[in-house]
């Protein structure tokens, strides 16, 4: 009895326990290997579900980029062409639109989306910028994300290009037309202001000759000023001739100096005619012949003087004879 128990314990116990830890150690090492790599979660999906991880939806290629517009061909989903080869990335073109697969929007698979909350491209962009992949990743995400918000309905490529190019031109035309309208509105506004100011300056009331004479007489009577004591007279006068009070006031202000200058000029002309050169007008009539000169004519009477030139000789015809009797023709010189 004593000999059998130790033999059983020594032979049986070590043998089953030794392979167990050996089998457990590789199982623990295997999950540690993918975790040691960067982005192990993404790599795990690439290993198992690479063809099912992403689905390529509508085409996002801008066919009007050269024209400065934005036009899509309307392809709703990527369909690999029969000539595409998985080993050759350049051959992955869509059979519907002919564009490369990279132009289509990449959408994560719905089955894997529940287990993986953040999308793989975002995690790759978050972890890799710190190392050496910072420049390449940013360009691809903006084109897929920006058109996602406003993706047009699937329309054929030719109609889409024509319609969007037309709308682009229309938008440009509308923008230019709105600019023209805005500038035209501003010009009209300024022109309207100028016309308002210009209308105040250029608006002139046309008066009849009767109104001008009456206003001139009234202005002379009032003294070319409108005073409070003359308000009743001004009101009655304006009602008589059919002129507004403000118009009469402006007319008096504008013509005050004009008529004063005319009066001053008329007075100067009268002074020159009357007293400037001591020239008195010669009137035909009865003239008393007082000759202090060389020739005297006797036998006075009514003399009719005919003056041939001012200051020259004059011929006198006498009705009654002079010293010699009969008609005497005399010449006098001053």
UniProtKB/Swiss-Prot annotation:
Keywords: DNA-binding, Gibberellin signaling pathway, Homeobox, Metal-binding, Nucleus, Transcription, Transcription regulation, Zinc, Zinc-finger. Residues 136-155 have a biased composition (Pro residues). The record marks 252 as: Required for DNA-binding. The keyword Lipid biosynthesis does not apply. Residues 1-15 have a biased composition (Low complexity). One of its GO terms (biological process) is gibberellic acid mediated signaling pathway. This is Zinc-finger homeodomain protein 10. It comes from Arabidopsis thaliana (Mouse-ear cress).
């Amino acid at each position: 009895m004593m000999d059998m128990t130790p033999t059983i314990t020594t032979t049986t116990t070590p043998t089953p326990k030794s392979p167990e830890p050996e089998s457990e150690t590789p199982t623990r090492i295997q999950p540690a290997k993918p975790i040691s790599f960067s982005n192990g979660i993404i790599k795990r999906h690439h290993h198992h579900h690479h063809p099912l991880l992403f689905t390529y939806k509508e085409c996002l290629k801008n066919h009007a980029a050269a024209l400065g517009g934005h036009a899509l061909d309307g392809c709703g989903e990527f369909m690999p062409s029969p000539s595409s080869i998985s080993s050759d990335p350049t051959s992955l073109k869509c059979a519907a639109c002919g564009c490369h697969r990279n132009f289509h929007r990449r959408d994560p698979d719905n089955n894997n989306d529940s287990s993986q909350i953040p999308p793989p491209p975002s995690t790759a962009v978050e972890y890799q910028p710190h190392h050496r992949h910072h420049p390449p990743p940013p360009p691809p995400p903006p084109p897929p994300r920006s058109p996602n918000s406003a993706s047009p309905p699937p329309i054929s490529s030719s109609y889409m290009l024509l319609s969007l190019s037309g709308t682009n031109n229309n938008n440009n035309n509308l923008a230019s037309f709105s600019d023209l309208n805005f500038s035209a509105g501003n010009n009209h506004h300024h022109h309207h202001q100028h016309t308002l100011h210009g209308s105040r300056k250029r608006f002139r009331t046309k008066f009849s000759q009767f109104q001008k004479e009456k206003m001139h007489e009234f202005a002379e009577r009032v003294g070319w000023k409108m005073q409070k004591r003359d308000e009743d007279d001004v009101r009655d006068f304006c009602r008589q001739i059919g002129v507004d009070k403000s118009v009469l006031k402006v007319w008096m202000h504008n013509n005050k100096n004009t008529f004063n200058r005319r009066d001053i000029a008329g007075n100067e002309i009268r002074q020159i005619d009357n007293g400037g050169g001591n020239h008195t007008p010669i009137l035909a009539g009865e003239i008393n012949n007082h000759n202090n000169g060389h020739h005297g004519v006797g036998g006075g009477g009514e003399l009719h003087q005919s003056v041939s030139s001012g200051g020259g000789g004059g011929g006198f015809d006498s009705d009654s004879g002079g010293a010699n009797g009969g008609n005497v023709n005399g010449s006098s010189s001053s």
